[in-house]
């Protein structure tokens, strides 16, 4: 019986691994700094105490958590002779990846719904997107994330692993792990696509439809009134594409390509959480103003101290 899995990682070259260590160390530092900056800014600035920024702060927390499931181990493994993870540790990675990933899908859908109400039904916005609704959305997000991760774990936990234990990646995920099972996994592959793949594609299509409706609504408004809404909407759409693009190929595409899978795995777990804070900060005047105010407050506090 297999008690551990060996990651093949991103490269066998020692020189390249040193470069990758420095690169991803900087990237992960940027992920921690950028996402925590958004959370602290939203919490500390009363002007940002609105449903959109509440959801944005929670999205940043989930991005940070999702990246932290894989990035720290990947970084430390660059200097390890054997990149090993225990069987239980592998299952924990699968659970957490799908827990945070499923929760993020719900939050992205909620953010799309929030923009739809704000732009298409502005008179009903405060009634629909009230405080209780925001708390309810987060409860649903965590609940769906939990149910989704449990269903994913159920696919793998009872599989027999008695032969190869090399995972051609830098973290454990269900599509890669089930290929190592000592049994026919064709039906299981179909079930994984039916679960994660259908959930991903349906969520993505729903968001594309909602943002298309919003864009059509904005087109009929005067330019001066639509510019701010369009700027915010562009940031949302960019983040949706960055998150769902890799997910569709990883979980819904029936013909995986190993080299592409590794690139998409890096993009999904590192690049997207790194870019999201940059996108929301650069495309949002309120966020940029709040961050400047936070810096002034920090500088003023330092002088007083």
From Swiss-Prot:
Keywords attached to this entry: Cell membrane, Disulfide bond, G-protein coupled receptor, Membrane, Olfaction, Receptor, Sensory transduction, Transducer, Transmembrane, Transmembrane helix
Pfam families in the record: 7tm_4 (PF13853)
InterPro entries: GPCR_Rhodpsn, GPCR_Rhodpsn_7TM, Olfact_rcpt, Olfactory_Receptors
Disulfide bond sites: 90-182
Keyword Cell membrane: yes
GO cellular component: plasma membrane
GO molecular function, a single term: olfactory receptor activity
Family: Belongs to the G-protein coupled receptor 1 family.
Name of this protein: Olfactory receptor 4F17
Species this protein is from: Homo sapiens
């Amino acid at each position: 019986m297999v008690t551990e899995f060996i990651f093949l990682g991103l490269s066998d070259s020692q020189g390249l691994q040193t470069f990758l260590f420095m690169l991803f160390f900087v990237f992960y530092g940027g992920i921690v700094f950028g996402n925590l900056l958004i959370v602290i800014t939203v919490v500390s600035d009363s002007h940002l105490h609105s449903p959109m920024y509440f959801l944005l702060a929670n999205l940043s927390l989930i991005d940070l958590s999702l990246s932290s499931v894989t990035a720290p181990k990947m970084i430390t493994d660059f200097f390890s002779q054997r990149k090993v993870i225990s069987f239980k540790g592998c299952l924990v990675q699968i659970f957490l990846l799908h827990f945070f990933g499923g929760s993020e899908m719900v939050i992205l859908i909620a953010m799309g719904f929030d923009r739809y109400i704000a732009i298409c039904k502005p008179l009903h916005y405060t009634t629909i997107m009230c405080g209780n609704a925001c708390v309810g959305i987060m409860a649903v997000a965590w609940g769906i994330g939990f149910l989704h991760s449990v269903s994913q774990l159920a696919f793998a936990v009872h599989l027999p692993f008695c032969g190869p234990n090399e995972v051609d990646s830098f973290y454990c995920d269900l599509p890669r792990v089930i290929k190592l099972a000592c049994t026919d996994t064709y039906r299981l592959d179909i079930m994984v696509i039916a679960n994660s793949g259908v959930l991903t594609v349906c969520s993505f299509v729903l968001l594309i439809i909602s943002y298309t409706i919003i864009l059509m609504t904005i087109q009929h408004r005067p330019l001066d009134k639509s510019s701010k809404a369009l700027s915010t909407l562009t940031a949302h759409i960019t983040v949706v594409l960055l998150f769902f693009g890799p997910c569709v190929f990883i979980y819904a595409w029936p013909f995986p390509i190993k080299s592409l899978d590794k690139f998409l795995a890096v993009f999904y777990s590192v690049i997207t959480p790194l870019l999201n804070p940059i996108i929301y900060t650069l495309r949002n005047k309120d966020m940029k103003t709040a961050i400047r105010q936070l810096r002034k407050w920090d500088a003023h506090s330092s002088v007083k101290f």
